[in-house]
Amino acid sequence: MTTSAVEVVIGVIPSAKTKTGMFSTAAYTLVVTNYRLIFARMTNDLVKQNTERVRAEAKAGGAGFFGQWGAQLKAAFAFAQRYLAMEPAAILAESPGNGFVDPSQVRQLKVERKWRSAGSDDDNSQAYLRIIIETTAGKTTYDTDGETPNANDAKLLFSRTFGALVR
């Protein structure tokens, strides 16, 4: 008698954006399971609901204006973290734009640490991740808002599912 392992979420990469046109992008949370990579679309409605929920929780906890504002700033990270407690099937069903790739479809998955200008006079730079996924259908590039997790941790996370395909 054989039993197959249950699919579980093993990690997330928040706020990964990919170009969808000349001036437009789509934001996703990259959800890594023990079997595949799920692309969970961050729709405006989902982000708005999450922000309202986080602010309401802060207000119910006695937070004033600045406490609610601080909670709202942390909402994007909290948005991604909620996927850690969800079933993969529920994540896929959450939004019409959600999808996945499994290791048999991936030729290479590359994680790079990049820098972007913060746009100020003192030229502070911000680190971010560039994740390039080359599949049998083509290549897609995702840039994160920051470096959470860092590049090495992201590579380790992806390698748990994609093994030697991760560079």
Regions found by a protein language model. Give the residues of each.
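Acidic, Ser/Thr- and proline-rich intrinsically disordered linker/docking segments
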Residues: 3-8, 18-27, 35-167
